[in-house]
Amino acid sequence: MAISPTATELLLASFAFCLVFWVVRAWQPRVPKGLKSPPGPWGWPLLGHVLTLGKNPHLVLARLSQRYGDVLQIRIGSTPVLVLSGLDTIRQALVQQGDDFKGRPNLYSFSLVTDGHSMSFSPDSGPVWAARRRLAQSALNTFSIASDPASSSSCYLEDHVSKEAEALLSRLQEQMAEVGSFDPHSQVVLSVANVIGAMCFGQHFPQDSEEKLSLIHSSNIFVENAYSGNPVDFFPILQYIPTPGLQRFKAFNQKLVQFLQKIIQEHYQDFDENNIQDITGALLKHCKKGSRANGGRIPHEKIVSLINDIFGAGFDTVTTAISWSLMYLVTNPEKQRKIQEELDTVVGRARRPRLSDRLQLPYLEASILEIFRHSSFIPFTVPHSTTRDTTLNGFYIPEKHLVFINQWQVNHDQKVWGDPFEFRPERFLTADGTAINKILSEKVMIFGLGKRRCIGEVLAKWEVFLFLAILLQQLEFSVPAGVKVDLTPIYGLTMRHVRCEHVQARPRFSIK
């Protein structure tokens, strides 16, 4: 027998619905006259859109932007989240209105990074933060892209990468002789860590430390947890549930800080302000001589947070970029051959490629840009927040509003790229194929924009170029016939590809 609801039950249900609707409306900020709130889909009570986002939020939000526009709003739990798409809209927010959108949200996962003192993840955005960011940028540039007077290389970065690329070539050859194949990521990660370690710590960076190797090979724990949309940041009860992922994230951050603190302390023991040879030395010198005004002088305990940011910026992004590059090239052998033909013509085989060759190697540069664009391995920037009430595209955005920047959508916008899902490096070349199309190259979004743009962007681009140039000059990369390479991204702060242990590398000529 069917049971029909009574009038009392219907009345109670209607009352409950109205109460929930009233509470939700009461939480929403008042919108000034003449403006409107950003549009977006209705979400589930209490949950919001967390189930809608699924395992690939960048794809879901890109589809929603087609319906609701470049400025849309969702909820994760009870937290409203502004989602920005479209290059013009994102530039307007992060560049033209950069002061309005330069904040960082106070998220739980961010508080676990260097105990909440990270320059990149902390909610600080005032004068002290700006001064320390400039200091970190200056120190990074000095010991990476600035010239090295004690070396024949053009800069510190070229010197470090050239040495590590040679070591990587040797390891790949040994792996081929012993096993017959290798996993690119596990081989590249050590070389990239040694490069940024040498720039940060010089001779103090350990070469064969088990602690270092353990941290390097477990770095995926960080990107698997510090991503846009992590439920632990929106449902506070999850902070008290000891899930394995959260426990590993806490442990990894603690171990990394302890590792860096130990190296910095050793560095301090023999510090000589008249003989500065690395980033840590430059920061220690600034501690002694800097002014306290506007945060210009930093306390010793803050050095570890700056070094953590620099080390992270120069490590994970570059490792992921090179690993993706090799996977794209084994699945597109004709593109790999074109790069190698260009290297043979411009560089030859008698010497190694150098950073000064970049302008003469446009096809390699175009291929790197296309790998950045097509993979979009950093799908979102680190989340932003508004620093004050503002407007964007006619929509009212209140202060302290959480903001997601969908870089994946920008890099796959059909209005910009025409055929965004085709892997075609040639799109970035000028009509005569001799140079990079600067206007189009600046539309690739991978390092953010504006006041929070990644301080290691130039370093990362140069490092990826030089590693790939040296590797591709010497080796031909492939997979055995019948092996299918899975290029499906695994979502995270940086997206990894499915690990492949079947990559092979053979000398293109006698390696000297």
UniProtKB/Swiss-Prot annotation:
Q: Which residues are glycosylated?
A: 65
- Can you tell me where the transmembrane regions are? none
Entry GO terms, CC:
endoplasmic reticulum membrane; intracellular membrane-bounded organelle
Binding sites annotated in the UniProt record for heme = 454
PROSITE patterns per the UniProt record, alphabetical: CYTOCHROME_P450 (PS00086)
| Recorded GO MF terms | caffeine oxidase activity; demethylase activity; enzyme binding; estrogen 16-alpha-hydroxylase activity; estrogen 2-hydroxylase activity; heme binding; hydroperoxy icosatetraenoate dehydratase activity; iron ion binding
Q: Which reaction does it catalyse?
A: an organic molecule + reduced [NADPH--hemoprotein reductase] + O2 = an alcohol + oxidized [NADPH--hemoprotein reductase] + H2O + H(+); 17beta-estradiol + reduced [NADPH--hemoprotein reductase] + O2 = 2-hydroxy-17beta-estradiol + oxidized [NADPH--hemoprotein reductase] + H2O + H(+); 17beta-estradiol + reduced [NADPH--hemoprotein reductase] + O2 = 4-hydroxy-17beta-estradiol + oxidized [NADPH--hemoprotein reductase] + H2O + H(+); estrone + reduced [NADPH--hemoprotein reductase] + O2 = 2-hydroxyestrone + oxidized [NADPH--hemoprotein reductase] + H2O + H(+)
Q: Which UniProt keywords apply?
A: Endoplasmic reticulum, Fatty acid metabolism, Glycoprotein, Heme, Iron, Lipid metabolism, Lyase, Membrane, Metal-binding, Microsome, Monooxygenase, Oxidoreductase, Steroid metabolism, Sterol metabolism
- Please describe what this protein does: A cytochrome P450 monooxygenase involved in the metabolism of various endogenous substrates, including fatty acids, steroid hormones and vitamins. Mechanistically, uses molecular oxygen inserting one oxygen atom into a substrate, and reducing the second into a water molecule, with two electrons provided by NADPH via cytochrome P450 reductase (NADPH--hemoprotein reductase). Catalyzes the hydroxylation of carbon-hydrogen bonds. Exhibits high catalytic activity for the formation of hydroxyestrogens from estrone (E1) and 17beta-estradiol (E2), namely 2-hydroxy E1 and E2.
What protein name applies here? Cytochrome P450 1A2
Q: Which organism is it from?
A: Felis catus
What taxonomic lineage is listed for the species of origin? Eukaryota, Metazoa, Chordata, Craniata, Vertebrata
